[in-house]
């Protein structure tokens, strides 16, 4: 990504402790440590058993072992293919998740996150029903978090690295560009292995769910100017 988010500068941040966000990050890291320590063959087998294999979900292939077939829609959200994949996903969740948790409350945020992830998994299966390799990662759920952030904090400044320079950019640029790139690149899964349809499905779910689940005091598309931060600003 050309714009690498570092942190957000939110005037409403810090109202509640984001226990669920921290818990989700901790679970993903613990699972990552556990599976990355496995022998390579065992790790590969595990991904095929509890990762999301569309051909298994569509009944083209038999399920492997006793793992419930449709549970992979959920379990795939907590698996990653390496440390870079894990750390980058958790970094985005750490930046954007606390704001959505603060807006929705702890329990509703947990439900929101899981529903975004399940939708992302389902959309990916529909987009590639014959695929025989596993899809794993939290990015579909996190795409939903980012879409919700765009809708309730569109003008919040995000400190990003634009190539090598720190710049404060409005959230609608950072997240808007990221979402647009998912649509631009949606046909390139075979080339880069990135599940763009999962991201799109998660983002659409997040946009719809934040409308349905937000408390009455949480406004949509409301711009509030945060305190000035270092670096240049793009509005």
Q: Model-predicted segments: where are they?
A:
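A detector for small-residue-rich transmembrane helices and their helix-helix packing motifs
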Residues: 1-235
